């Protein structure tokens, strides 16, 4: 399915939102994250839309943390691992279709909606396993391969780090491409596209309905996919500055510098969202948009409805209006 061209109504100004909304696709659903709340909407096996929401931990999303460059980049890791895994576990529960009344209780103020606990020990265990897997595959493995090659080729800071970065990039692209061949993951990628398109519609002050959401592309410059690609690029530069010490020191440095790299990547992502028309930032975000061709699919109408339901729940919790803002006229 191909996205139609965007047609902007002339009588609606761009929404000057104070919040940069983000999100993540889950199993048959979408998680949306705002300034103080997160919301999840999932298409249940009976075709109803199930939604839930919870406040964000303000020690991470508010106060001084969000004002410190580099340090606030850690919230992106929390998004991808902490919040994302909670939302994923919630969506998996819904798909199991064996919920009891004690586990799922209808909400009084939402259409087919539930309030469920998003905090489970299993989620944290899964986060830990995911972190170990990610660090092992995408940081330690490329270094181990380069370290093995250095037994036959003299070590050189430039080529060693370039080779390590190239291997890391190949692993990343190969991973997202291969899992994208799985039917279930294809649907997750379609919900990923629906998430982006809904955010586009909100940011362009269009009504949140499938007719308007469908006009937008499934790629978005603030996507976490772009974040991952920036992590790879920044790691090449940063690790090159460290030279080629003993292999165990390099492995330790890769692990310890992950928060620093994430912080730098997050700042670039913020700049890309703040200055989308800047020629320099267009060059910076372009590779991430290209990579999203692998991690997004154009959704069908039912998938857009789920993304819209998630955004509407979030806007309600954030005290924002889901309706387009109307341009004021001088008297």
Region spans (language model):
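Juxtamembrane "helix exit" motif at the C-terminal ends of alpha-helical transmembrane segments
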Residues: 90-94, 130-155, 231-255, 259-262, ...
């Amino acid at each position: 399915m191909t996205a139609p061209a965007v047609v902007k109504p002339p009588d609606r100004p761009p929404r000057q939102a104070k919040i940069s909304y983000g999100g993540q696709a889950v199993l048959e659903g979408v998680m949306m994250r705002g300034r103080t709340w997160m919301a999840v909407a999932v298409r249940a096996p009976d075709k109803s839309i199930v939604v839930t929401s919870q406040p964000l931990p303000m020690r991470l999303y508010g106060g001084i943390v969000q004002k410190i460059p580099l340090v606030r980049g850690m919230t992106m890791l929390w998004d991808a691992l902490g919040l994302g895994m909670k939302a994923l576990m919630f969506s998996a529960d819904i798909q199991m279709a064996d919920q009891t009344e004690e586990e799922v209780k209808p909400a009084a103020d939402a259409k087919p909606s539930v309030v469920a606990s998003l905090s489970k020990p299993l989620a944290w265990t899964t986060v830990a396993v995911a972190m170990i897997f990610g660090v092992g595959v995408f940081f330690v493995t490329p270094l181990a391969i380069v370290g093995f090659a250095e037994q036959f080729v003299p070590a050189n800071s430039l080529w060693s780090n370039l080779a390590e970065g190239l291997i890391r990039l190949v692993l990343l692209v190969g991973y997202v491409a291969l899992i994208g061949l799985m039917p279930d993951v294809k649907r997750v990628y379609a919900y990923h596209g629906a998430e982006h398109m809904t955010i586009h519609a909100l940011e362009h002050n269009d009504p949140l309905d499938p007719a308007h959401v469908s006009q937008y592309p499934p790629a978005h410059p603030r996507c976490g996919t772009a974040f991952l690609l920036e992590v790879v690029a920044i790691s090449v530069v940063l690790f090159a500055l460290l030279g080629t010490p003993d292999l165990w020191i390099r492995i330790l440095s890769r692990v310890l510098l992950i928060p620093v790299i994430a912080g730098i990547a997050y700042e670039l992502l913020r700049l890309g969202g703040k200055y989308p028309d800047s020629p320099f930032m267009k060059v910076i975000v372009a590779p991430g948009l290209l990579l999203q061709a692998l991690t997004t699919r154009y959704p069908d109408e039912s998938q857009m409805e789920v993304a819209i339901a998630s955004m509407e729940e979030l806007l309600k919790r954030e005290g924002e209006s889901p309706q387009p803002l109307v341009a004021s006229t001088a008297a």
